[in-house]
Amino acid sequence: MSRRAFAGGALVGAAGLAPSLAATAKMKAIDCHAHLSHHSRKDWEAADRNLIDMADRLQIDALCCSILSPRRPATADDFRQCNDWMAEAMRRYPGRILGYCFVNPGYIKETRAEVSRCIEKLGFMGVKLYNDYLATEPVLWPLVEQTIELRIPILHHAAHAYWLSPPQPRVSDGGTFAELARRYPEAMIICAHIAGGGDWEWTVKSLKNAPSVYLDTSGSVPDEGMVEMAVRTLGADRVLFACDNSLTASVGRIRSAVLSDADRVKVMAGNIQRIMARRRG
């Protein structure tokens, strides 16, 4: 193919996308994976305001947030403090900031009590886990069963990259979540940041036969085609718009993805709204 023909085809493709790109500005957007700052950070208030300001500029209507302890693995006191701050943020930004309950499932009794407090008393919308344990370790099972009872999702840190093994020996990946889903098909698991580094194509393929596992689109890796492959392989109902605080890259990724408007509506907000509605239902 000549360069002229290639360029002509690209222009036609871009022209065809233009209406959809314009339409995305009017679509509701909910970031299903965001973080507010731990209060040990001196400028945490400014950092949180900056996140909201960026969300305003990028037309993100709501952010599902957690606050993580910089000390890991977090103690029970650590995660309770983080969730207290999260509840304060939800009160400061009602309807704009939605809360994940951050816990370390190694504290089995404390985790159960904290999830109950956050979900049933403070109005949080889900649970956030880091890499303290693989998602398939039995220590997680009581928590997973509790989330099934409460009809809430677990947003789980994830990666599939060989270079993470030394610093994160218990990091889960798509295959780990698929295995967990076979044990608990009723659980709602969100595999974090397809664009967070590592082999994202492997991640998408590994989740194909795990229908209860969702994939969020966050991260800073700029590869093209991530969202399209995820929607094509998993179906639009299982892909969730997210930024993980990489807002410009993540918004650009979802707004420029070659999707039908119906699929884009699902990915940008409809799917996470449907997940949250299960709790209210």
Located regions from the model:
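Mid-to-C-terminal alpha-helical segments outside catalytic/metal-binding sites
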Residues: S2-L21, M27-C32, E45, R49-A62, ...
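Mobile, glycine- and charge-enriched loop segments
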Residues: A25-R41, L98-C101
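Active-site neighborhood of phospho(di)ester-bond hydrolases with catalytic His/Asp-centered motifs
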Residues: I30-C32, C65-S66, Y100-F102, K128, ...
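Conserved, mostly hydrophobic/aromatic
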Residues: H33, A55, M86, T147, ...
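Alpha-helical scaffolding within the catalytic cores
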Residues: A46-L51, Q81-W85, A113, D173-F177, ...
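Active-site gating/metal-coordination segments in enzymes
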Residues: D61, D77-Y162
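Glycine-rich, proline-tolerant flexible connector loops at the mouths of alpha/beta enzymes
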Residues: I67-D78
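Catalytic pocket-lining loop regions of alpha/beta-barrel enzymes
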Residues: L122-G126, Y133-L240
